[in-house]
C-alpha cells in the first residue's frame, strides 16, 4: 500500500507544482506584504515515515513571535487575518507539494506530527509511523474545521467557569479527544488501504466535500 501511495505522489507532484507555481508566487508575495517582518514560508521538523525527521514546508499563517504550542483555535491571536483565510481553505498546505515531490510526504496519509506528539505513540499505535505523511487524509478531512471545534470547546468550558487559559483548555481537549481519534483513524487507514479511497479523499479535500469512511462521515 505504501509503495502505491509513494508512486502516485512522486509522479503527480511535479506537474501540479508546475501548474500552481503562479498561485504559489502570488501567495508568497501577499504574505510578505500582509505579514511583514518574517518569511513567507514556515518550516518545521516533523516526524515522517519510520520515525525519520524531515523539514515540512507550509505558508506562514502566524505572527513571527508566538508561543511554541502546536494547538490553535479559531480567533487565536497568533494567527493573522490572512493566515486564518489560508488555513480555512488549506492554502497554507500547498508548499507541501515540494515535500511530496522529494519523497518526504504523500498526497494522502496522516498529517506529520511534531516529535513531541509522535513520541506518545505506543504499542500498535506506532504502525501509523510506517505510513508516509500526507497533505490530506481521513483524519485531516474529519478535522478540517479543527480550529473551530477547539474554539467552541474552549468557549463552552470558559462559560462553565473553567479558569485555565484558552491555550491550556485547547491542549487538554486535543490531547484527550482529537489526537487519539486521529490515531484511531490513521490506524484504520493503514490496515484498510484503498487506492480508490485515496482518490476520493483528494477530490473531497479540493472540493470541500464530505465522504463516508469506516462507517462515519468525514
Indicate residue ranges for each PLM-predicted region.
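Periplasmic N-terminal gating module of Gram-negative TonB-dependent outer-membrane receptors
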Residues: 90-94
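A hydrophobic, helix-centered structural microdomain
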Residues: 8-64, 189-218
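Gly/Thr-rich phosphate-binding loop signature of adenosyl cofactor/nucleotide-binding cores
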Residues: 97
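Short, well-ordered beta-strand elements within core beta-sheets of diverse protein domains
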Residues: 82-89, 186-191
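Short, exposed "boundary/linker" segments that immediately precede the start
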Residues: 1-7
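Cytosolic-biased juxtamembrane loops and peripheral soluble domains of multi-pass membrane proteins
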Residues: 63-85, 114-121, 152-153
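Residue-level signal for cytosolic alpha-helical hairpin/rod architecture
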Residues: 11, 79-82, 184
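Hydrophobic structural segments characteristic of membrane proteins
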Residues: 39, 101-218
Amino acid at each position: 500500500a505504501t509503495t502505491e501511495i509513494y508512486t502516485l505522489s512522486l509522479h503527480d507532484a511535479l506537474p501540479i507544482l508546475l501548474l500552481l507555481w503562479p498561485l504559489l508566487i502570488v501567495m508568497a508575495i501577499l504574505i510578505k506584504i500582509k505579514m511583514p517582518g518574517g518569511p513567507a514560508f514556515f518550516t518545521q521538523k516533523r516526524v515522517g515515515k519510520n520515525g525519520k525527521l524531515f523539514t515540512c514546508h507550509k505558508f506562514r499563517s502566524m505572527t513571527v513571535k508566538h508561543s511554541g504550542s502546536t494547538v490553535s483555535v479559531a480567533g487565536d491571536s497568533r494567527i493573522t487575518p490572512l493566515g486564518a483565510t489560508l488555513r480555512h481553505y488549506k492554502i497554507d498546505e500547498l508548499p507541501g507539494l515540494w515535500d511530496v515531490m522529494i519523497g518526504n510526504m504523500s498526497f494522502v496519509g496522516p498529517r506529520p506530527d511534531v516529535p513531541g506528539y509522535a513520541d506518545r505513540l505506543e504499542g500498535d499505535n506506532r504502525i501509523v509511523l510506517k505510513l508516509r505523511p500526507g497533505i490530506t487524509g481521513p483524519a485531516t478531512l474529519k478535522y478540517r474545521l479543527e480550529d473551530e471545534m477547539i474554539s467552541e470547546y474552549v468557549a463552552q468550558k470558559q462559560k462553565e467557569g473553567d479558569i485555565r487559559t484558552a491555550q491550556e483548555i485547547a491542549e487538554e481537549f486535543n490531547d484527550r479527544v482529537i489526537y487519539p481519534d486521529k490515531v484511531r483513524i490513521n490506524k484504520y487507514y493503514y490496515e484498510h488501504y484503498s487506492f480508490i479511497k485515496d482518490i476520493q479523499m483528494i477530490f473531497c479535500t479540493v472540493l470541500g466535500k464530505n465522504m463516508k469512511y469506516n462507517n462515519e462521515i468525514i
